[in-house]
Structure formats: C-alpha cells, structure tokens
Amino acid sequence: MSNEASPAFESVLTALKAEKVIAYPTEAVFGLGCDPDSEKAVNELLILKKRPWQKGLILIADNYEQLQPYLDDKLLTEEQKKAMFACWPGPVTWVIPAKFSAPKWLTGQFATLAVRVSDHPLVKQLCTFYGKPLVSTSANLNGLEPCRTAEEVRQQFGDKLPILNGDVGGRKNPSEIRDALTGELYRQG
C-alpha cells in the first residue's frame, strides 16, 4: 500500500473530515460510510438511507485496534475472541458489547455494536489513511437492491455524495452477522 493517496482518494478523505457521507466498495456491495464520531454525519447517512437510528449501525475497520475504543470486549472469553479473530479480516460482522461511552447514534437501542475488520483493499486503505473505522451500511435506497458499481450509486443517489470508485469484492451476499457472546447467526452471509 502506498503512503500517498491519489487525488480521488484525497477528495473522499476530505469529505470524511468535513463530516460528509461517502460511498465506497466493500466485499460484496458499495457501502455508505462516514465518521463514526460525527453525530452530524451519521444523521445525514440515516436520512439518506431512510433508516431509523434505533436499528444501530456497523463499523468497518482495517484492524481490530481501530474498533477497540467503542467496544467492551472484556466481556468476551478468550474462546469467543478466538472465534471472532478466526474470521477476520473478512466478511463476517460480529455484534459485541459496546462501551457505555459508545455513541447512541451508533448502537441505536442496543448495548452492543456490530463491527467488522475488512479484507477489501480500498476499505483497509481508507480506514488506515483516515485513522479510524467508518460507519458502513449498504448503498441503496429503501426497497432497492444494494449498489454494486459506482454508476449504480450515482443512479440511486445522484451527485449527493463523493464516491470512491473501485470494484466490490467477489462476494454475492452482504456480510454474515453473528453475536460474539452467543454465536447466534443474525444474517447469513
């Protein structure tokens, strides 16, 4: 990975720093993302998606350390952590107890947070350059299929947000979602 970002990459980073929503490719579909610490940006994302805040959101990161400020992982056993780390980096999202200080705009009505360490090269690079995880939800309007190309993002959202152009990974389905405490499967991947 280069230590310098391209101009297109820089424009997406600038948008993140300005508390804007961006679109970017992930393992299966394009995602909408923003700075998880910006209530303004998260609210903008929720409005774009027509998604109620109570549902909570997913954080996507380059590495587990980026997620730790939001998580109360001391509630997990070594065995539970081992199961989680065996799936990362990769397309499995784990629901983990959140720190009490984790913003409600991320956790929604829950005391947990859904998190994933991505293996998509552009996601990894984006989180590395930005220095923290991103909120990640599929790029699609309510009732429409998730976007798989930058052009589909433009068709659904117009010019409302900057797009990091690139290919999605080879997966057909969105990430699997599992509960780290119970192992329960919430969504098949």
Swiss-Prot record:
Q: NCBIfam families this protein is in?
A: PRK10634.1 (NF007919)
Say what the protein does.
Required for the formation of a threonylcarbamoyl group on adenosine at position 37 (t(6)A37) in tRNAs that read codons beginning with adenine. Catalyzes the conversion of L-threonine, HCO(3)(-)/CO(2) and ATP to give threonylcarbamoyl-AMP (TC-AMP) as the acyladenylate intermediate, with the release of diphosphate.
Q: Which GO terms describe its molecular function?
A: ATP binding; double-stranded RNA binding; L-threonylcarbamoyladenylate synthase; tRNA binding
Residues annotated as domain YrdC-like = 6-189
The enzyme class is transferase
Q: Which GO terms describe its biological process?
A: regulation of translational fidelity; tRNA threonylcarbamoyladenosine modification
Q: Which InterPro entries match?
A: DHBP_synth_RibB-like_a/b_dom, Sua5-like_dom, TC-AMP_synthase, TC-AMP_synthase_SUA5
Q: Which chain positions lie within coiled-coil regions?
A: none
> What Gene Ontology terms describe where this protein resides (cellular component)?
cytoplasm
State its Enzyme Commission number(s).
2.7.7.87
Protein name per its UniProtKB record? Threonylcarbamoyl-AMP synthase
Q: What is its main location?
A: cytoplasm
Q: What is the similarity comment for this entry?
A: Belongs to the SUA5 family. TsaC subfamily.
* Catalytic activity, as annotated: L-threonine + hydrogencarbonate + ATP = L-threonylcarbamoyladenylate + diphosphate + H2O
Q: Domain of life here?
A: Bacteria
Compartments annotated for it: namely:
Cytoplasm
Q: Which UniProt keywords apply?
A: ATP-binding, Cytoplasm, Nucleotide-binding, Nucleotidyltransferase, Transferase, tRNA processing
The organism is Photorhabdus laumondii subsp. laumondii (strain DSM 15139 / CIP 105565 / TT01)
Q: Does the keyword GTP-binding apply?
A: no
